[in-house]
Amino acid sequence: MNDFTFTDKGFEEYIYWQTKDRKTANKINTLLKDIRRNGAMQGTGKPEKLKSNKGYSRRIDDANRLVYEIDELQNIKIISCKGHYDD
């Protein structure tokens, strides 16, 4: 299905980038499209499985990671997109 949902924190951070830094916002949007196209573990942003939970991460830039989960229906839940994991 590949629908996107956000946690409250993930949505607040996504809106932050949309209003404060268009370059980072565009990178996040590119990563989201890539996740939809290639799945959790392939594509840009050096995707990796997180050890602490069932999620995944991709590099937005040196300081920020896109953290997400994919459920059994292939829906993508954005957990965070600001900071490095739980910073």
What are these regions (language model features)?
Residues 1-4, 9-17, 22-26, 59-65, ...:
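Enriched for short, Lys/Arg-rich terminal
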Residues 33-59:
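A short, surface-exposed loop/turn module that caps and links secondary-structure elements
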